[in-house]
Curated annotation (Swiss-Prot):
GO cellular component: a single term: extracellular region
Species the sequence originates in: Ovis aries
Class of this enzyme: hydrolase
E.C. numbers: 3.4.23.-
Lineage, top ranks: Eukaryota, Metazoa, Chordata, Craniata, Vertebrata
Subcellular location: Secreted
One GO BP annotation of this record: proteolysis
Protein name: Pregnancy-associated glycoprotein 55
Keywords, sorted A to Z: Aspartyl protease, Glycoprotein, Hydrolase, Protease, Secreted
Modified how: Glycosylated.
Hydrolase recorded as keyword: yes
Family statement: Belongs to the peptidase A1 family.
Length: 18
């Protein structure tokens, strides 16, 4: 539950910071 959902936003935030 929320596996993806949690990984999707996490990866998006890191891509914007990097």
């Amino acid at each position: 539950r929320g596996s993806x959902l949690t990984i999707l936003p996490l990866r998006n935030m890191r891509d914007i910071v990097y």
